[in-house]
Amino acid sequence: MSSEKEIQQQLSQMQGQGFDPEAQQRQEAQRQEANERRQGILIQILTPDARERLSRITIVKPEKSRQIEDLIIRAAQTGQLTERVDDAKLISLLEQLSEKTKKTTITMKRRTIEDDD
């Protein structure tokens, strides 16, 4: 009986500290629902070839894929897209994004001086 009381006390303490399993479940359900809506929009906008390319990009670089998805969805919502995005259009969007996010690398080559001492 004392173990049940301890469990109840621990649960009430965790809920008092902001740990609410029901709230976490609701948040997870909301995230999943938003992701499903997002995928539904992308299915309507992208051709099958473009969706396949984007899914391969997601495997390698999820953050880049997310940026492209956001860009495409925003363009569709603002009416900038008049037709479905095909593979060629997706490639051009990827190139534009790559140009914006190119990283500059600097390599320093130091000369070594040989002393004949």
Curated annotation (Swiss-Prot):
Residues 23-39 have a biased composition (Basic and acidic residues). It comes from the Eukaryota. GO terms for molecular function: DNA binding. Keywords: DNA-binding. SUPFAM superfamilies: Double-stranded DNA-binding domain. The keyword DNA-binding applies. Disulfide bonds: none annotated. The keyword Ribonucleoprotein does not apply. One of its GO terms (cellular component) is nucleus. Residues 1-40 are annotated as: Disordered. Residues 8-22 have a biased composition (Low complexity). Belongs to the PDCD5 family. PANTHER family: PROGRAMMED CELL DEATH PROTEIN 5 (PTHR10840:SF0). This is DNA-binding protein DDB_G0278111. It comes from Dictyostelium discoideum. The lineage of its organism: Eukaryota, Amoebozoa, Evosea, Eumycetozoa, Dictyostelia.
